[in-house]
UniProtKB/Swiss-Prot annotation:
Homology family: Belongs to the CheD family.
Signal peptide: none
Protein function: Probably deamidates glutamine residues to glutamate on methyl-accepting chemotaxis receptors (MCPs), playing an important role in chemotaxis.
Protein name, UniProt field: Probable chemoreceptor glutamine deamidase CheD
Gene3D superfamilies, A to Z: 3.30.1330.200
GO MF: protein-glutamine glutaminase activity
Originating species: Trichlorobacter lovleyi (strain ATCC BAA-1151 / DSM 17278 / SZ) (Geobacter lovleyi)
E.C. number: 3.5.1.44
Amino acid sequence: MSEQDGSPIRKYFLFPGATHVDAEECEITTVLGSCVAVCLWDQRHGGGGMNHFMLPLWNGEGLATPKYGSIAMERLLEQVLAIGARKEHLVAKVFGGANLLSTSSAACPIGERNIELAMTQLEEWRIAVVATDLGGRVGRKIIMNTMTGVVLLGRGKQQNQ
């Protein structure tokens, strides 16, 4: 229930390669493995959103979709600013980037590259990162409240090697 008026909170499931932003209260849920999700929230006025990207960089071929971190990060910031958030009031929370494959090649650590892209972009934008849960060998489920900025985190079980 919404703290403001007792009405049910709207819920949105964020699929990989997507972004969702809301100026009103909404709970955005996603599930992460090697993908990364960045939550941006306006700490002064509320409202915010989340992206969920699978690969770090778009190579210029095909569609420039938010499945690529370089696109997803730009889209998320543009959309959060479009709902009235102010860049100087934004804070970020970053999740995911796990290495779930036991045979994962050191030459292609997708999770690590996704984390690096997100953190570098936020640093360039001078947006403070106030919470992270990154890397490791377990998946995650996160639920972000766009009005309060609270993110609930659940972790999967560690797989035995």
